[in-house]
Amino acid sequence: MDLTPREKDKMLIFTAGLVAERRLARGVKLNYPEAMAYISAALLEGARDGQTVADLMHYGTTLLTRDQVMEGIPEMIPEIQVEATFPDGTKLVTVHQPIA
């Protein structure tokens, strides 16, 4: 399989997002990279499904709560920016205060 660097990045985010999803299902609190991957993967999938940028900006704030991440993680992630592929092209999705 010959992937571009961008495709490799997406695969890495998706794989790390799956690990984070499984840990959440077991009740394990997520660390910084896991929380970033979990939210980023969900945003990428939402874009692929055809959701709008505005919908994803709101959706990104509903994915994780403070109780699901380690102490101090919400403060470490004031925003997340993901370059996602939508049906009409690539757009930047910014989620402010993603962990409520």
Swiss-Prot record:
Listed Gene3D superfamilies: Urease, gamma-like subunit (3.30.280.10)
UniProt keyword annotations, A-Z: Cytoplasm, Hydrolase
EC number(s) stated in the UniProt entry for this protein: 3.5.1.5
InterPro entries from the UniProt entry: Urease_gamma (IPR012010), Urease_gamma/gamma-beta_su (IPR002026), Urease_gamma_sf (IPR036463), Urease_subunit (IPR050069)
Cross-referenced Pfam families: Urease_gamma
Reactions mediated catalytically: urea + 2 H2O + H(+) = hydrogencarbonate + 2 NH4(+)
Gene Ontology CC annotations of this record: cytoplasm
One annotated GO biological process: urea catabolic process
Pathway(s) the chain acts in: Nitrogen metabolism; urea degradation; CO(2) and NH(3) from urea (urease route): step 1/1
Major localization listed first in the record, in broad terms: cytoplasm
Record's subcellular location: Cytoplasm
Residues making up the signal peptide according to the UniProt record: none
CDD domains on file: Urease_gamma (cd00390)
GO molecular function: nickel cation binding; urease activity
PANTHER family named among the record's database cross-references: UREASE
Subunit and interaction comment: Heterotrimer of UreA (gamma), UreB (beta) and UreC (alpha) subunits. Three heterotrimers associate to form the active enzyme.
Database matches in HAMAP family: Urease_gamma
Family: Belongs to the urease gamma subunit family.
Protein name as it appears in the record: Urease subunit gamma
Gene: ureA
